[in-house]
Amino acid sequence: MSRRLVAVWLLFVALAIAIVLIERQQRAVTSAEEGSRDARRLLPAELADLGAIEVMHKGTLHRFERDSAGAWFYHGIHTGSEQQHAHNADPAVAAQIEKAFTGFGRTRMERQFPLNIQADEFQVTRPDIFIMVYRPKEMQPLARYAVGIVAPDGVSRYVLPVGSTYVVTIANYQIDNLLNLIRAVGGKSGQGNPKK
């Protein structure tokens, strides 16, 4: 073999090694970024891993659940004296709920403040809005959130993850979207009514 051919092969091998090393480094950076983003998520689980979300707004509980096929429906409240019943998810309403919850599932915690229960400067000790998220078929919530007032910046809202010693801020539009969802589907006839 000529020296030129050997030089070309050595150059080719060096380029291949460089490409492999660059790819590994980019994967490591991407993994680290994804891990740090996950640490800022408000919800402790992916939306696909949740079976129900309850939003209490001014004393009224609004429950959203997934049916056996995984479609969301507005459940409403049952008195406990009712017999076994099933629900049918309206595809249009299910899509509307899925869209709102997909957005809520992406909620990121922005800032963090120490909780001072006596001062209640964020109004999270007696909130008008309280959110609970559940895994499928579980009675105890996976996480609970007391939603406080809108921050002075007008675009953030204070939220207390129950059990935390810190109040966090999230984008206020996430709460607005949940309240708009309640207004849109909470009053629709047929949603939450048992099918016997």
What are these language model-derived features?
Residues 1-196:
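A short-motif feature that recognizes glycine-rich, charge-decorated loops
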